[in-house]
């Protein structure tokens, strides 16, 4: 089953992306570099709980 997750910027801008992931094939927390439009550069986004 794919669960909804929130990827939050580590730059401290408060920007986030929402996506889904398969917890069975990827049980660890996701970390991915994506573009932060507030900081206007690519930064590390870390998985947090989607409320």
Curated annotation (Swiss-Prot):
UniProt-annotated stretches for the region Disordered? 1-23
Domain of life here? Bacteria
| GO molecular function ontology, one term from the record | structural constituent of ribosome
Which InterPro entries does the annotation name? Ribosomal_bL33, Ribosomal_bL33_CS, Ribosomal_bL33_sf, Ribosomal_zn-bd
Gene Ontology cellular component list: cytosolic large ribosomal subunit
Here the disulfide bonds are: none
Q: Where is the composition biased (Polar residues)?
A: 10-20
The alphabetized UniProt keywords are: Ribonucleoprotein, Ribosomal protein
Biological process terms from the Gene Ontology for this record are: translation
Q: Which family does it belong to?
A: Belongs to the bacterial ribosomal protein bL33 family.
Tell me the protein's name.
Answer: Large ribosomal subunit protein bL33
In which organism is this protein found? Chromobacterium violaceum (strain ATCC 12472 / DSM 30191 / JCM 1249 / CCUG 213 / NBRC 12614 / NCIMB 9131 / NCTC 9757 / MK)
From the UniProt record, report the name of the gene that encodes this protein.
rpmG
């Amino acid at each position: 089953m794919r669960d909804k997750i929130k990827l939050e910027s580590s730059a401290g801008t408060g920007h986030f992306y929402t996506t889904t992931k398969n917890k069975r094939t990827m049980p660890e927390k996701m970390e991915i570099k994506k573009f932060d439009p507030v900081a206007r550069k690519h930064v590390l986004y870390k998985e947090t709980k989607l409320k």
